[in-house]
């Protein structure tokens, strides 16, 4: 988690010439909103940087990283910035030599199979069918149907919302004055805003972080002028019927084998405090909790004064007492540990690695050794994932390959202090101390089946909340925060399980009554089977 400051606020690009122009404008007339925001950002940045400079532990490298953060934390990029170029790299390890030499994952074009939300349209041949003679005059064979058809993908754009204006014909009697209006067709529906409108607004707002004013502007430019208050009301009315799905996700998450979680700061303008929270605690947070249970992943978000460990404890209250403690992956902050429930605590190896990344420019060779050593461990974990190993097989694989590597790193860290090669209070000394102090929790993956290496999945989940904070700045009250938590939880759970969140939200609204009666049958991974079963029963009846 980053400390409060400019790094956690929306970045605004502004140059010295613009600031000078804003000052001149302020002498003549009141500033416009855009100019005011730029000037306010510049003043806040100056104040924050001044506070940092007054602290003796602040380094120029840390200040440069804060104001101009690196685009990547990959080892090669970090070492290159420290002056260690590709030509100086050590020989490839066994883990890296086995990797594919092709394009990096995620690059290149997608095949037709990747378009899971596309409509499939079978196209028969215009002049041939299976069994017909071959059109080639020099051939006497017959054509047959191939298993794989030819594929042509056509992609079209569409507006987030669409509207149909039904102009109902009206007839008036010239004698008695009665007016007779045509009835709306069945497809017009009974409600002005159908389920798909609410789903799309929620998906853009809480799934993609689009603020209300920007969403309103986009729709208005496309000819659908929907006020912010109306859209907010639509989403609020949708949230209540979907609450049983969130409650069921929490219940099914409680027996999970592994839980990842982290916190980020959030602002709620009007927040009534929980009775069990100390009055001295003034912060407001959003906790992102990702549970892994039987190959399923459940994302839960909690916004309020409670820390991640306290929110985790609320879910663990529903955990069956006969189950063993879950594996808990988080950073090393004490507030992340639930007070009243036992867990197998693992700390994030990426956090330990990040401490060395920050001081690489000052200690290039020492940090190079640590970064490449940890890179080797991650290489072995990638191999285990590629091979599809079970948790027990993965544990033995890591013990055989990563165990000696981590032991070598531990010996090296201890030698830096024992031989007085590193000053304990230096940046490198603090990074080494962090590793040694949390060594048992950082290496749980060498002792417990299924223990992860890092907390990256929770940090990625929190990006939804961070995106909301950067674009919308705050929630108005607790109800707004809870509504955001609900939709973020449902949407991100769908994404983690490769389910279409738009379709899922639509079906939950259409079957709100069934959802309330049997929420366990309307979860992202089984609602399709429930729909098929319900449809079959209705058809049979």
Q: Which residue ranges define each predicted feature?
A:
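Short, flexible loop/hinge motifs at secondary-structure junctions
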Residues: 1-189, 260-261, 330, 406
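Catalytic center-proximal scaffold of phosphoryl-transfer enzymes
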Residues: 1-29, 33-40, 111-115, 131, ...
């Amino acid at each position: 988690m980053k400390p409060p400051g400019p790094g956690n606020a929306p970045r605004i690009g502004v140059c010295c010439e613009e600031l000078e122009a804003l000052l001149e404008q302020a002498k003549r007339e009141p500033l416009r909103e855009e100019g005011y925001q730029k000037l306010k950002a510049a003043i806040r940045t100056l104040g924050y940087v001044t506070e940092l400079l007054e602290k003796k532990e602040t380094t120029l490298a840390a200040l440069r990283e804060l104001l101009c953060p690196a685009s990547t934390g990959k080892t090669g990029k970090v070492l290159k910035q420290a002056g260690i170029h590709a030509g100086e790299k050590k020989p490839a390890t066994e883990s890296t030599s086995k990797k594919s030499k092709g394009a990096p994952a995620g690059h290149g074009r997608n095949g037709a199979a990747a378009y899971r939300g596309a409509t499939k349209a079978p196209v028969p041949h215009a002049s041939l069918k299976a069994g017909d003679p071959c059109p080639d005059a020099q051939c006497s064979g017959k054509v047959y149907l191939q298993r794989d058809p030819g594929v042509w993908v056509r992609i079209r754009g569409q507006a987030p919302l669409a509207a149909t204006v039904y102009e109902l014909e009206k007839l008036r009697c010239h004698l008695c004055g009665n007016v007779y209006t045509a009835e709306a067709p069945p497809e017009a529906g009974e409600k002005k805003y159908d389920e798909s409108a609410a789903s799309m607004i929620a998906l853009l707002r809480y799934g993609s972080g689009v603020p209300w004013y920007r969403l309103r502007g986009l729709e208005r430019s496309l000819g659908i002028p929907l006020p912010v208050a109306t859209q907010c009301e639509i989403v609020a009315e949708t949230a209540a019927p979907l609450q049983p799905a969130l409650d069921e996700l929490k219940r099914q998450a409680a027996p999970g084998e592994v839980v990842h979680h982290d916190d980020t700061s959030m602002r709620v303008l009007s927040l009534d405090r929980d009775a069990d929270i100390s009055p001295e605690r003034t912060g407001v947070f959003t906790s992102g909790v990702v549970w892994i249970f039987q190959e399923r992943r459940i994302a839960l978000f909690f916004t309020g004064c409670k820390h991640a460990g306290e929110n985790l404890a609320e879910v663990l209250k529903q955990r069956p007492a006969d189950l063993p403690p879950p594996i808990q992956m988080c950073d090393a902050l004490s507030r992340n540990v639930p007070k009243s429930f036992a867990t197998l605590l693992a700390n994030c190896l990426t956090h330990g690695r990040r401490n060395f990344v920050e001081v690489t420019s000052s200690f290039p060779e020492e940090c190079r050794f640590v970064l490449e050593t940890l890179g080797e461990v991650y290489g072995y974990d990638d191999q285990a994932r590629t091979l599809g190993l079970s948790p027990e097989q993965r544990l033995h694989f890591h013990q055989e390959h990563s165990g000696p590597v981590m032991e070598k790193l531990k010996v090296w860290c201890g030698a830096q202090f024992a031989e007085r090669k590193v000053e304990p209070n230096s940046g490198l000394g603090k990074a080494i101390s962090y590793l040694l102090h949390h060594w048992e929790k950082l290496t749980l993956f060498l002792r417990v089946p299924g223990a992860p290496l890092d907390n990256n999945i929770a940090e990625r989940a929190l990006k939804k909340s961070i995106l909301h904070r950067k674009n919308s700045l705050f929630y108005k009250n607790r109800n707004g925060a809870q509504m955001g938590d609900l939709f973020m939880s449902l949407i991100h759970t769908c994404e983690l399980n490769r389910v279409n969140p738009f379709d899922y939200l639509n079906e939950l609204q259409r079957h709100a009554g069934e959802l309330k009666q049997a929420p366990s049958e309307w979860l992202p991974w089984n609602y399709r089977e429930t729909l098929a079963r319900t449809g079959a029963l209705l058809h049979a009846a």
